[in-house]
Amino acid sequence: MKVLWAALLVTFLAGCQAKVEQPVEPETEPELRQQAEGQSGQPWELALGRFWDYLRWVQTLSEQVQEELLSPQVTQELTTLMDETMKELKAYKSELEEQLSPVAEETRARLSKELQAAQARLGADMEDVRSRLVQYRSEVQAMLGQSTEELRARLASHLRKLRKRLLRDADDLQKRLARLGPLVEQGRVRAATVGSLASQPLQERAQAKLRARMEEMGSRTRDRLDEVKEQVAEVRAKLEEQAQQISLQAEAFQARLKSWFEPLVEDMQRQWAGLVEKVQAAVGASTAPVPSDNH
């Protein structure tokens, strides 16, 4: 990836520092293309490389530069490459944010904000390049038929400055993305841990859950039995106490009844005995022999 960036930087410097009419050395292009193909960077980096390659091609135009810049083809091509670069960058940013999902929300939001700002700066730089070319095309149209050497020099100067800004902002964005590496790895480890837990056999997890549930129910049942035993013992003690009180009350009532009825019974016994004696006396008198008149 770093080799690709270096190759593109060398290419861009060569295009900016050389005169516009100067042809490109034939040995440089195959070497740079081979280095670019040998390094498989992120899609957004490759798209940015294509943007730089096209800009370099525009700068190395010779006699045809006025004709090409007078048509909207260059700006249209640059707009397409800009859109492609930003699209790839947004996709890569979204992929990183998905991998950062296990990270703390505050950290993820801060990193996302930083990446978005760097992405906006890079997009603004590319838009500035396109605007400069549009402005140059307008000035060339106004000076049609006149010498455009001064305009070309101004354009080359502007593009050199813009190249530095592009390089700085792209390098800043790349560094910020590189700082996400440890966090992405941390998110992958957490995701792998969760995945290993989720890959346990369903039966094993169900049995573990059932055992935990049975242990909980057994503990609750034992607690309930102990509570019932305490309640039964308490009720038994109360019943025994009440039975003892009833027994004492019955004995006291029996004693009171006895004290009430004993005098009556004794009086009735005496009266009965006297009545029996009277009856016996009457019966004895009636059975005595009557004296005869013949004597």
From Swiss-Prot:
Modified residues (Methionine sulfoxide): 143
LDL and other lipoprotein receptors binding: annotated segments: 158-168
Keywords: Chylomicron, Endosome, Extracellular matrix, HDL, Heparin-binding, Lipid transport, Lipid-binding, Oxidation, Phosphoprotein, Repeat, Secreted, Signal, Transport, VLDL
Lipid-binding and lipoprotein association, as annotated region: 191-268
Signal peptide: 1-18
GO function terms (MF aspect): cholesterol transfer activity; heparan sulfate proteoglycan binding; heparin binding; identical protein binding; low-density lipoprotein particle receptor binding; phosphatidylcholine-sterol O-acyltransferase activator activity; phospholipid binding
Residues where heparin binds: 162-165
Location(s), subcellular: Secreted; Secreted, Extracellular space; Secreted, Extracellular space, Extracellular matrix; Extracellular vesicle
Record GO biological process: acylglycerol homeostasis; cholesterol efflux; cholesterol metabolic process; chylomicron remnant clearance; high-density lipoprotein particle assembly; intermediate-density lipoprotein particle clearance; lipoprotein biosynthetic process; melanosome organization
RNA-binding is among the record's keywords: no
Subunit details: Homotetramer. May interact with ABCA1; functionally associated with ABCA1 in the biogenesis of HDLs. May interact with APP/A4 amyloid-beta peptide; the interaction is extremely stable in vitro but its physiological significance is unclear. May interact with MAPT. May interact with MAP2. In the cerebrospinal fluid, interacts with secreted SORL1. Interacts with PMEL; this allows the loading of PMEL luminal fragment on ILVs to induce fibril nucleation.
Function: APOE is an apolipoprotein, a protein associating with lipid particles, that mainly functions in lipoprotein-mediated lipid transport between organs via the plasma and interstitial fluids. APOE is a core component of plasma lipoproteins and is involved in their production, conversion and clearance. Apolipoproteins are amphipathic molecules that interact both with lipids of the lipoprotein particle core and the aqueous environment of the plasma.
Protein name as annotated: Apolipoprotein E
The species this protein was found in: Macaca mulatta
Organism lineage string: Eukaryota, Metazoa, Chordata, Craniata, Vertebrata
